Amino acid sequence: MMSFERVAVLGLGKVGLLAATLLHEAGFEVLGIDANPTTEPLPFAVQADDVTSTEALVGEFGRVEAVLSCLPYHLNRAVAEAAHQCGIHYFDLTEDVPTTKAIVDLAATSNGVMAPQCGLAPGFVGIVGASLVAAFDHCRSLRLRVGALPQNPTGLLGYAFNWSPEGVVNEYLNDCEVIEDGVHKFVSAMEWKETIYVDGKHLEAFTTSGGLGTMCETYLGVVDNLDYKTIRYPGHMDLMNFFFHELLMRERRALAGEILTNAKPPVSEDIVYVHVASEGYVDGQLRRVEFVRSYVPHEVGGVRNTAIAWTTAGSVAAVIEMVRDGSLPQRGLLKQEQIPFDRFLATPTGRLFAG
């Protein structure tokens, strides 16, 4: 299966709708599927269907050559199984480690590409990181930092829930993979706090789960130190540790998400910070290379989209464009760190990330 045109996009929320629009603009024939699709006119076909039914999905997937799941992570396993059964390409945005492991198992016998974790982090940040590691004869550290924040925060938390509260709670509480001094290990989330500056703005970063995808497995024995941290405004981590651990909200994750979203609803004026830094040796000389960007809202298809929405949707759309063009593998597991950054930036959607 080389070039393909027909793509189903499951879940037409903000990110799914934007991803479908970007794929349509890149020349794909898009079929949007949602349990309760919008009635507003769209430039591609849309239909209502039960996205939780593997049987229903298998029926729909007979009409397409690839599927992008923008559904909540707990629904992705069934979608991946249906795609595997139909022999089509599969892409998703999941940060969930058990879901990804199930998809990795399916990829061993797939006829199409199985590409989980194609969003911002994991996803784009891993593509950037891999390009930096490749610049060294020996890499002693790769530090990946990403944060989606309100541009003009109020209050002590300095935050707004522009992303899934379920996803944020999980990444604040689940253990984090790292490589430390050549050893692959797990550490607690919301630790290892550091000060970071982007465009002169004072920020903090701390460990959160899921952002590395498969990178620890790939770079064990290659990179001495590898970790991922979330960027926030100063003071955020200490308050979240108080909320989850001293007040024991870690035992009531769903309620924690409700409380936080009610207090800090989404904003339209957001900013995504990406700070990727790597150190290592070239011809015996120690060097440091960085990729640092600040992404703000952007208009696509006549609609203004938040930074977190377009960076997430744009990353997966660019990867799908690359698979279509034959510049990526056509079957089996696709890891984000396998994706050449220069070719990513050369795609119609990837150009948005050049900054």
Per-region residue spans from a language model:
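N-terminal Rossmann-like NAD(P) cofactor-binding module of classical short-chain dehydrogenase/reductase
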Residues: 61, 65-69, 90-91
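Rossmann-fold NAD(P)-binding glycine/threonine-rich loop
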Residues: 93-116
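Hydrophobic/small residue at the entry helix of a nucleotide-binding pocket
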Residues: 15
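Conserved N-terminal Rossmann-fold NAD(P)-binding element of oxidoreductases
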Residues: 7-11
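C-terminal catalytic/substrate-binding lobe primarily of soluble NAD(P)-dependent oxidoreductases
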Residues: 4, 135-355
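Beta-loop-alpha module in the N-terminal Rossmann-like domain of NAD(P)-dependent dehydrogenases
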Residues: 55, 66-83, 96-99
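Conserved Rossmann-fold cofactor-binding substructure of NAD(P)-dependent oxidoreductases
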Residues: 51-62
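NAD(P)-binding Rossmann-fold cofactor-contacting core
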Residues: 30-42
